[in-house]
Amino acid sequence: MSDLELTVRPLRATVDTQAFSEALKNISLVLKKSDVPILEEASVRFSGGRCILTATDMTTWMIAEIPASGDDFSFIFSRTKKLELVCRRFDGSLTLEWTENTARHDGDGFVRLSCGSRTGEFDTWSTDLCPDIPKVDGDVSFSANAAELLERINRVAYATLK
């Protein structure tokens, strides 16, 4: 073999499918049609045994964090809304394998989702394209259950309708 072949090993992480699907559904609430395509997608970061999903419309930031195992890596989904529908069909342990597309020089790649015998591939974008989460210094901080808070907001949303 005269040419040196470079084999790229995909970075791999595993999450619970139901937790991932629920987290993706929750953060997708903030995703809207935008002139900036990256703002229509969800960012995913695996770090320190956690999977952190983020979405923004530049005024609201939604972040969901779930347990994960595997390598540390990050990417931005392409077609997040479709992926949300696909994840509802999976059950059990979900494996995400991210491979950088070496044919391109912009850091794009693809992610393969595997759950049992079902698999799917989605294009990804580099997290360099995603805006940074602004630092907020608050005098008071508190913890809240996001699901309960959203339920309360939905319960009184009728009062804001015209």
Where are the language model's segments positioned?
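Structural preference for solvent-exposed beta-strand-turn elements
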Residues: M1-K162
